[in-house]
Amino acid sequence: MSFQLDTSTHGAEIRNVYEKVLSGADDCSWAIFGYEKGQGNILKVVASGNDNDEFLDEFDENAVLFGFLRVKDVNTGLNKFVLVCWCGEAAARKGLFSIHMATVSNLLKGYHVQITGRESSDLNMDDIIRRVADASGSKYSVHTSNSTPQSKHNAFYDASQTFGSTAKVAPAPAPSTKTPLANISKPVVQAQKDSKDNSWDDSSKQSNTQTANTTSNLRVPVNASWSDAGRKEKSQENKPKPTPFGSGGPSKPTPFESHGPAKQISVQPSEHPKPSISTTTTGSSYRSAESSHAPTTPDHFKLTPLTKLEPQPPSGSPSKKPVSELEELHTAGNVNLSARRALFEKKESSTKNVENPVSHHLKSPVRTSFPPASTTASKQDSPSTVPVDKQETAKPINKQVSSNETSAQEEPRESVAALRARFAKANVSENNDPPTFPKTAAKISSFNSKAGTSFAKPRPFTNNPNPISAPEKPTSGESLSLNPPPAMPKVFPERDISSASQKAAQPSVITPSVPQPPAAPVVPEAPSVHQPPAAPVAPEVPSAPQRPAAPVVPEAPSVPQRPAVPVVPEALSVPQPPVAPVAPEVPSVPQPPVAPVVPEAPSVPQPPVAPVAPEVPSVPQRPAVPVVPEAPSVPQPPAAPVVPEVPSVPQRPAVPVVPEAPSVPQPPAAPVVPEVPSVPQPPAVPVVPEAGQLNEPVVPPLPPHDETQEPQVGGDVKATEHTQPTKTPAIVIYDYSPEEENEIELVENEQIQILEFVDDGWWLGENSKGQQGLFPSNYVEITGPNETANNPPAEPQAGGPGKSVKAIYDYQAQEDNELSFFEDEIIANVDCVDPNWWEGECHGHRGLFPSNYVEEI
């Protein structure tokens, strides 16, 4: 016997209801499946509907059911599906539940949550909705442009965007310099993703998403107006496109430095376009791409002062007060002024009176462990330029923070070599797309054009399977990309690989980057957590030397572990129970077929005999009753089927009146009784009816025609006692038509000769036509001297032939061969044919009567 669940018998109906729930039909939001009645392995649809309360009411504790429910996710507003597997406390055949549950789970695919219950407290609609919400994994809503973070940013930005005034906004405190660079968190500049006018490209949107999920240890006010870039696009149309600026490593926009007195650039409103510097080319101010990237020497630091390269403000400028380049960049909406003012002003004040800024920066011991640049520009620079920028940009943070009092208007200029080294280091992540800084890029481009240098434009970010491949070589006219890098974590592995390839070209200053590889293998997993957009923050690293690479590491492995946890228990729960509980129920199944096989079929004719038993006490049993079972052995006439009616003969209406009736046995004439049911009873008057009024009795079955058999008469008398060798005359009292070939026809009042008393119910005789055969003994009456042979009596208990008795009770004949009489009447010619039944004459009629109804005279 198979214990597998049958889903094909009602497969079409199951599929239709299941598809209705999946398709979101209004009239069907749930369906319940159960077993067909009487068939424990056939699955069918039990109920369906759209009321969730009715869904929970359908689960009965006496059944095993499977439910499929559609609910609305409160987080996303989408339709979610729930599979409910129910095994009631009082359900039968619980052992097959786990096997069938696995089959139903494969059949009803597409569910999000599976719930197993066994009592009503296990199923609650609020709990089901909560589980669906927890399983969705999204417990946030989409922010609009009017969100709270944007309002805070606007308030802060409005308070700090007045650049012409002398008021300064206090910068956020910088973290301690003891914090390792590897643990510096990413600044939260990307919190401006909810800006009203965010027309940046996809890279900025990607970076916004990353920063929203990144925790920052740097307490920097969120006031970088990334959205201002969109507003400035129209004003920048007349300006040349800024040179792209890519930064995957630590870099910062710094004021220009020179050996001469520093000129300050006055900030003009965006509606006054500035003259293009990067596009103004002269033969003496530019060098070829090949020469610009050739190895540099200390002679590069001896350049013409940058005062000659600075653009002059428009003649119509409303303010002549010089401002710093940092404020100008903030005007373009691309710099977090409040966060960086303290960092840059310290540098401006410290380098104001220094003749050689390079030698001054070389004294700083900080940031020696930061990985070197690995891009094309850094490879082609001289070894001296990389450490210069490396140490120049890595001043102690304490000094930078303490320089908040320094005026931003005093800005020394950097040398060309320092700028080139810093830009090359900023271009370390050529696969990233940093945000665009229009005015900063313009100044860098103009500076390069004057200094005769150019930088290669890094390739766009791609999922390069081979990060060891060398980057493209720069070409003349190309500029650094200014798109936001997609992922800061991607920068570290490339730096490590590229640093290994640059050991020959760059001296011991690059070696500090070797300790970084431990963080590399963990960070590549971060892109799956959507961290790529954090790269745009790279240019702001100088403001706070802390990096959040460490906190990101534990989050990456935790994300893939969540989906694996719920799957394991469900998979293990399916294969456990299929074998054990099924065994005890196997023997119970084959038993029912044994019950329907009715072995009592042959006993069907016995029920009629059963009622005779209780009624026997009421009427004396006839001696012929035991002879009835022998009739089937002889070829029976058509009346044989009537034999089962013999039990009804013993019933007598007068029996309840007679206390002695229970002890009366049946007379030997009982075989004749079967035909009585078809004949009405004679009148109660003791007057003997005429022969024409008597009804024909039922023919008893023929006894087996076997001469060797010794038939019994009266239950104890052998056939030899009543078998006569001579003919005995008899008269026919009823007409009889033969139904078998060995029978003869009898006509009423016809004289026949009895040849042999074969049985109490059948005799062998010869009619007036000379035909010999069997005939019913109760259809004739013996008239000759051998009259007693008709019913050979047993040993008479009282008297002999011609004896008379007196009736002591009224008796109504139940059969045609019985005698009716009233109390005190005399019955003559009594023959004691049986101890319980006697034969006598009364009112001109002869018949049988119970012996306990009379007394001897």
Swiss-Prot record:
Composition-biased stretches (Pro residues): 587-596, 602-611
Domain SH3 positions: 725-785, 800-857
Record-level GO cellular component terms: actin body; actin cortical patch; cell division site; cell tip; cortical actin cytoskeleton; site of polarized growth
Cited PROSITE patterns: ADF_H, SH3
Region (Disordered): 167-562, 585-622, 693-723
Polar residues compositional bias, start-end: 276-295, 371-385, 399-409, 443-452, 498-511
Keyword Repeat appears in the UniProt entry: yes
Pfam family, one: Cofilin_ADF
InterPro entries: Abp1_fungi_SH3_C2, ADF-H, ADF-H/Gelsolin-like_dom_sf, SH3-like_dom_sf, SH3_domain
GO biological-process terms attached to the record: regulation of actin filament polymerization
Extent of Basic and acidic residues compositional bias: 193-204, 229-240
Gene Ontology molecular function, alphabetical: actin filament binding
Domain ADF-H span(s) in chain numbering: 6-133
Keywords, ordered alphabetically: Repeat, SH3 domain
Low complexity composition bias: residue spans: 205-217, 522-561, 612-622
Protein name listed in UniProt: Protein app1
Gene this protein is translated from: app1
